[in-house]
Amino acid sequence: MAAFPPGGTFFDTLKRSFTDVPVESGKIATTQFLEACESLTTLFDVLGSTAFKPVKSDMTGNIKKIRDRQLAAPVDSETLQDLVRNELATKKHTATEGLVWLNRALDFTAQALRQNLTNSGEEVSVSFRSAYGNTLSKHHSFMIKPIFSAAMSATPYRKDFYAKLGDDQARVEKELGVWLSSLENIVKILNDFLASKEAKW
């Protein structure tokens, strides 16, 4: 089954794109960010393997932790940075820790797709394995690594993956590039913020 409307691309199906997440003075809008993350998880359905279920489940679990905090204290959580600062001030860190793990997963996904988009002859599995080694692998236990390694090995062939994103490959690559640039910008902002003293517990 196609993951895109006739004449369109996968990116037309997203409820929220990272290109539509407001970022003002380096502050990231919480609601739109979470919607964009939820939309990103549908990419793992396009990858088509049940092996990616743990990856998707991990991301949706962390999205829920952040949203639960936002719903509990909406005024204090309009941006991700405000949410983190205000949660840590209460001596709790459930949502903050969720954001750390969610951002690692976003970084992994962004690096994998960027590497694959840049290297047109590379299979998707190679790009995802490389990105996993650069990102999530450093933080996963020996129990978790085999589960994620199985997902890397279960990715579709490159030609099949891109065909699932749209019929017009030039348009797919262009839209993927724009979407990725926005995602990478958000990941960089979060990497810097989460590494700062004010995001530590």
Swiss-Prot record:
Q: Which SUPFAM superfamilies match?
A: Glycolipid transfer protein, GLTP
- What results from gene inactivation? Partially loses the ability to secrete liamocins and leads swollen cells and accumulation of intracellular lipids.
Q: Which Gene3D superfamilies match?
A: Glycolipid transfer protein
Does Transcription show up as a keyword for this record?
Answer: no
- Any single Pfam family the record assigns to this protein: GLTP
What induces or represses this gene?
Expression is regulated by the cAMP-PKA and HOG1 signaling pathways via the transcriptional activator MSN2.
Q: Does the keyword Transcription regulation apply?
A: no
Keywords, comma-separated and alphabetical: Lipid transport, Lipid-binding, Transport
User: Which InterPro entries is this protein grouped with?
Assistant: GLTP_sf, Glycolipid_transfer_prot_dom
Q: Which GO terms describe its cellular component?
A: cytosol; membrane
**Biotechnological and industrial applications of this entry:** Liamocins have high bioactivity against the pathogenic bacteria Streptococcus spp. and can be potential new specific inhibitors of oral streptococcal biofilms without affecting normal oral microflora. Liamocins are also able to inhibit human cancer cell lines such as breast cancer cell lines T47D and SK-BR3 or the cervical cancer cell line HeLa.
Q: Which GO terms describe its molecular function?
A: ceramide 1-phosphate binding; ceramide 1-phosphate transfer activity
Glycolipid transfer protein homology domain: region residues:
28-168
Quote the function comment for this protein.
Answer: Cargo transport protein that plays a key role in transport and secretion of liamocins, glycolipids (also called heavy oils) composed of a single mannitol or arabitol headgroup linked to either three, four or even six 3,5-dihydroxydecanoic ester tail-groups.
Q: What is this protein called?
A: Glycolipid transfer protein
The species is: Aureobasidium melanogenum
